[in-house]
Swiss-Prot record:
PANTHER family: ELECTRON TRANSPORT COMPLEX PROTEIN RNFD (PTHR30578), ION-TRANSLOCATING OXIDOREDUCTASE COMPLEX SUBUNIT D (PTHR30578:SF0). Its cofactor is FMN. Pfam families: NQR2_RnfD_RnfE. GO terms for cellular component: plasma membrane. This is Ion-translocating oxidoreductase complex subunit D.
Length: 348
């Protein structure tokens, strides 16, 4: 019997880059569906705009670099970046903002560094932070869930708000936001941060009917949907367990300790874990294999740092949610984390 001689590695993974990206996009579907149910057609419009912008931007830059455009676009990495930006922004954001964020993410945060696998920062978070820093008011202008709002927007009305700034009846994005009980709607984290600064107790705020039914309940379902997608990624062995577990564990521990010491100022862990972009960040952002740590111990450190920074920024910073800033700050530390978390080589 003859045996073939081949060089290592002898074990090969059947998962290509494109298949990993497409499976990750599939895992995003529950979260996207939850957002569509709660916020309406705007989510799909933003998704379409982001995808179109990502593909065009990537194709133009690849052509300028004399790369084969069709082959590079097939890896679906641009689609994933676009999807992450689309689910992170308010559904009725003006069209040019999502175009700006996506183009910046693809051209500056990804291709300028050399393309897929070369970027030190998560492109989707770079694009998101660009909008958050440049246009903070529109980026915090979230709609109330459709189940409680007085204005259910059709696809045509949604398109009118996104592309023209107002509905056929003349209602602007801000006016649509204030149709629920005559008060402006906010994400749970934004609501708690604003009202606690006015002297209201967090314990009282989280038990109010408005917070439970209108604000937190919807975001809880969104986070649970992204959690379901994250579990799918675990089952498919596409992401390591260390990074999300470390992030969520650190955030839960910090919020539990803070709530125990000062319940009037800090919300319970359940609020922290199921509000904002917590689950999206834990399973789809910080698990990016390019911009996160590559060692087992390093992933624990990286995730713990992100979780700790999220808690600090949420409660002591100027923004209600700190996932994007935390991820980008920790991206800077990845080379240092990897250097000091390498396992000792046998024999040395």
């Amino acid at each position: 019997m003859s045996f073939a001689i081949a060089v290592s590695p002898h074990g090969h993974s059947q998962k290509s880059t494109s298949s990993v990206m497409r499976l990750t996009l599939l895992a995003l579907v529950p979260g996207i569906a939850a957002q569509c149910y709660l916020f309406g057609w705007g989510v799909l419009f933003q998704l379409g705009l982001a995808i179109l912008t990502a593909l065009v931007s990537e194709a133009v830059i690849l052509r300028m670099r004399n790369y084969v455009v069709s082959a590079s676009l097939k890896d679906s990495s641009a689609l994933l970046t676009a999807a992450l930006i689309a689910v992170a922004i308010p559904p009725l954001l003006p069209w040019w903002m999502v175009v700006l964020a996506t183009a910046f993410a693809i051209i500056i945060a990804k291709q300028l560094y050399g393309g897929l696998g070369q970027n030190p920062f998560n492109p989707a978070m770079v694009g998101y932070v660009l909008l958050l820093v440049s246009f903070p008011a529109p980026m915090t202008n979230w709609m109330a869930p459709q189940a409680v709002t007085a204005q259910l927007l059709s696809p045509a009305e949604t398109a009118a708000v996104i592309f023209q700034g107002k509905t056929s009846e003349g209602l602007t994005n801000y006016q649509l936001k204030t149709l629920v009980d005559g008060s402006t709607m906010a994400t749970p984290l934004d609501h708690l941060k604003t009202e606690s600064k006015r002297g209201h107790s967090v314990d009282t705020l989280v038990t109010s009917a408005n917070f439970t039914a209108v604000s937190h309940e919807g975001w809880r379902w969104i986070n649970l949907s992204f959690l379901a997608g994250g579990i799918l990624l675990f089952m498919l062995r596409l992401i390591p367990w260390q990074t999300p577990v470390a992030m969520l564990g650190t955030l839960a521990a910090a919020s539990a300790l803070a709530h125990y010491l000062a319940p009037a100022q800090f919300a319970m862990p359940e609020i922290e874990l199921l509000s904002g972009a917590t689950m999206l960040g834990a399973f789809f952002i910080i698990t990016d294999p390019v911009t996160s740590s590559t060692t087992s111990r390093g992933r624990l450190v990286f995730g713990a740092l992100v979780g700790g920074l999220v808690f600090i920024i949420r409660h002591f910073g100027g923004y209600p949610d700190g996932v994007a800033f935390s991820v980008l700050l920790c991206n800077i530390l990845v080379p240092l984390i990897d250097k000091y978390s390498q396992s000792r080589v046998y024999g040395h």
